[in-house]
Amino acid sequence: MPEPYDVITMGRIGVDLYPLQAGLPLARVDAFGKFLGGSPTNVAVAAARLGRRTAVVTRTGRDAFGEYLHQQLREFGVDDRWVTAVGEYPTPVTFCEIFPPDDFPLYFYRQPKAPDLEIHESELDLDAVRSARVFWMTGTGLCAEPSCSATLAALRARNRCGITVFDLDWRPMFWEEPQRAAADGPPHPAASARYREALAHATVAVGNLDECEIATGEREPYAAARALLAAGVELAVVKQGPAGVLAVHRDGSVADVPPLPVEVVNGLGAGDAFGGALCHGLLAGWETARIMRYANAAGAIVASRLACSSAMPFPHEVEAALTAGTAGAAGPGSSPPQAPTESGTAS
């Protein structure tokens, strides 16, 4: 039997076209960098950078951008055997704007449909999914068929064995559903129902406060964590932005960890670095607080850099950031130049 993967992720992939100039709206940007993108794909890259054997289950268009994504996955050491092409739809492209420290608008081009939503249950290698030490899926994978059925089939095949992570990953623009059925009901009833179904098969849930509210109806961090545990997971990880991260385990242990100081260049991708480091720490068997500190540091490093996938840190960089107590930008994914001021010099 083939050696099990440390981490298999399933879901979104695409090409990130990010400005090489900060502080400018897209209408004024004239230089872009091209990068591998898609949250679960970035998580696989992040875990691979930390020495883990990883693979991605997803689909691209049958086009030049799809070929580029295969090339990038191989260069990052991520197995692409389950990345297949869809002839009908183009590979998605995502643009962003960069307004540090906390404004990074995203523009997704996934019409008429993203190939990664065309994953079919019949195409899954369920033996590999079952045997992986960590299986990582996302909320976006539940937003449309056949991806939703395939994702739930993978979760059922896992049968809560090993570490099964549900990244709540709430992207409302990807969902098509009617307005809430009742005034006192959830704002997105179809999404909430699918999230509850997935949580019943997961052992770990990860999300920010907005995502936790979709999954549980709770926004207060401790209440959200308790609701995630009640939904079935063993470990609830609630990301609180500038307030850090809260992790609550079913065994009663709690880790409320502040963020690592960082001068933010691009906050996009920090959560994916956090996810890859979370997988790494869980596989290493570390105690919860140590995992959260390590994952926070990995995320902070990526936030100090321009790109997402190519900015994922190596172990020595994470350890150096933890030792220094701050994250710097040294390494791949360099900082973009600042937008010109009125005098024409960089701000």
Regions found by a protein language model. Give the residues of each.
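Conserved beta-alpha-beta core of the PfkB/ribokinase-like small-molecule kinase fold
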Residues: V134-A227, A243-V245
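Short, conserved phosphate/pyrophosphate- and ester-handling motifs at nucleotide-, phospho-/glycolipid
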Residues: A47, N208, G271
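Conserved N-terminal subdomain of the carbohydrate kinase-like
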Residues: R53-G139, A320-S347
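Glycine-centered short loops/turns at secondary-structure junctions
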Residues: G51, G77, C161-G162, G232, ...
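A short, aliphatic-rich alpha-helical micro-motif
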Residues: P2, L126-R130, A198-L199
